Amino acid sequence: MNDLIDKLLAWRGSGKSGDQAKKRLKLILAHDRADLSPELLSMMRQEILEVVGRYLDIDTEETELLLESDQRTTALIANFPIRRIKRRPLTEKLP
């Protein structure tokens, strides 16, 4: 299950294995508290990338979507490496 969540959220760890284990545990706890299935997270990730991609040229390989949770709230945190901002004519309508 951890491998699936890591792939869906494009999680990349660094540092000591203990730190990586803590990050994975936090991710699993946040996932459980948010009650989101891996399929739903994957769909959300794809849709978010599509919307952001309308306005920004982003590095999708380095994009991270993380769930973080504390005792009161769960947050979806997105990190998008921006290559450039796409310029659109003001009259162009969004899809």
From Swiss-Prot:
Asked whether the UniProt record includes Cell division among its keywords, one would answer: yes
- Which keywords does this Swiss-Prot/TrEMBL entry list? Cell cycle, Cell division
GO biological process per UniProt: cell division; regulation of division septum assembly
- Database matches in SUPFAM superfamilies: Cell division protein MinE topological specificity domain
Domain of life, per the record? Bacteria
Recorded hits in InterPro entries, A to Z, give: MinE, MinE_sf
The UniProt family comment states: Belongs to the MinE family.
What the protein does? Prevents the cell division inhibition by proteins MinC and MinD at internal division sites while permitting inhibition at polar sites. This ensures cell division at the proper site by restricting the formation of a division septum at the midpoint of the long axis of the cell.
Name listed for the protein in its UniProt record: Cell division topological specificity factor
Species of provenance:
Microcystis aeruginosa (strain NIES-843 / IAM M-2473)
